[in-house]
From Swiss-Prot:
Name recorded for this polypeptide: Putative pyruvate, phosphate dikinase regulatory protein
Cysteine-cysteine disulfides: none
Keywords recorded for this protein, A-Z: Kinase, Nucleotide-binding, Serine/threonine-protein kinase, Transferase
Family of this protein: Belongs to the pyruvate, phosphate/water dikinase regulatory protein family. PDRP subfamily.
EC number, UniProt record: 2.7.11.32, 2.7.4.27
Domain of life the protein comes from: Bacteria
Keyword Amino-acid biosynthesis recorded: no
Catalytic activity: N(tele)-phospho-L-histidyl/L-threonyl-[pyruvate, phosphate dikinase] + ADP = N(tele)-phospho-L-histidyl/O-phospho-L-threonyl-[pyruvate, phosphate dikinase] + AMP + H(+); N(tele)-phospho-L-histidyl/O-phospho-L-threonyl-[pyruvate, phosphate dikinase] + phosphate + H(+) = N(tele)-phospho-L-histidyl/L-threonyl-[pyruvate, phosphate dikinase] + diphosphate
Binding site for ADP: G154, V155, S156, R157, T158, S159, K160, T161
Alphabetized Pfam families for the sequence: Kinase-PPPase
GO molecular function: ADP binding; ATP binding; phosphotransferase activity, phosphate group as acceptor; protein serine/threonine kinase activity
Known role: Bifunctional serine/threonine kinase and phosphorylase involved in the regulation of the pyruvate, phosphate dikinase (PPDK) by catalyzing its phosphorylation/dephosphorylation.
Length: 279
């Protein structure tokens, strides 16, 4: 049962694969409950009765919500039976989706455990994109920008690097280049034809807040006055907007966006651009 103070609850995530799907779904839902925090217990690669028995022991010792992605029917049955026995809720995250697919497609699944993580072309595409994005982070190796799918530009602390890595995890080769007043942009940026160039923008207020937090975490507030000076930051933002207008870069406001939301917006811009080029 949930603790009487209601400050936290146990969340058991049982998977026959990596558990990434469970983690993503459960965190998205848990974020809607600000007054309680889940204590995550993640059990990946559960593929035998012996492994499941160890999981069930831990669940019984710390009762809570049980979410699972298991394909083996015997394992599913044993897990559900145990949860019912000790009176705790359990739910298959992938089961209802598979039933919907099966009803619509009129065929059964292959039952391959971890099929989404096989070493296929998509996997190697992600690895290639990650390698590219790490090499072309923060304005490095600009001679290779034409090989990117997306080039992110923006002033400091507009989430260029984390967004680049997120996109790379989706198989999108992403470079990022900082925009700094008084420093000329790489000439390669002026002549790009293949990549989509997206200019990330945030309000001066947001940039100052993020930068102050950054400096405090580094213990480096002295000597960085211009970095958080209101007029200097205003000038940076204006400089970036002028460049975006001059070169026709797509402009994306990120002030109130998470990394995931920013990446999703970039992917939509990329898809729209690709569709227009095909028409």
């Amino acid at each position: 049962m949930m603790p009487t103070d209601g400050s936290y609850f146990h969340l058991h995530l049982v998977s026959d694969s990596t558990g990434e799907t469970l983690i993503t779904v459960s965190r998205a839902v848990a974020a809607q409950y600000a007054n309680v925090s889940p204590v995550e217990h993640v059990y990946p690669l559960v593929r035998s009765q012996k492994q499941l028995d160890r999981v069930l022991t831990e669940i019984e010792e710390a009762p809570g919500i049980v979410l699972f992605t298991l394909l083996e029917k015997d394992l599913v049955g044993r897990l559900e039976a145990k949860c019912e026995e000790i009176n705790i809720p359990s739910l298959s995250i992938i089961g209802p989706v598979m039933q919907l697919f099966q009803a619509y497609l009129g065929s059964s699944t292959t039952g391959r455990v971890g099929a989404q993580h096989t070493l296929n072309a998509e996997y190697f595409k992600r690895i290639d994109a990650l390698n590219y994005s790490m090499i072309h982070d923060d304005g490095q190796h600009v001679e290779g920008l034409e090989d990117a799918d997306v080039v992110l530009v923006g002033v400091s602390r507009t989430s260029k690097t984390p967004t680049s890595i997120y996109l790379a995890n989706r198989g999108i080769r992403t470079a990022n280049v900082p925009l700094v007043p008084g420093i000329a942009i790489p000439h390669q940026l002026e002549t790009l034809t293949k990549p989509l160039v997206v200019s990330l923008h945030a309000t001066p207020e947001r940039l100052i807040q993020v930068r102050q937090n950054r400096l405090l975490s580094m213990g480096a507030t002295v000597g960085n006055e211009d970095y958080i000076d209101r007029q200097s930051v205003n000038d940076e933002v204006s400089f970036a907007r002028r460049l975006s207008a001059k070169y026709g870069w797509a402009l994306l406001e990120v002030t109130r966006r998470s990394i995931e939301e920013t990446a999703a917006a970039v992917m939509k811009l990329l898809a729209d651009r690709q569709r227009q080029r095909q028409e």
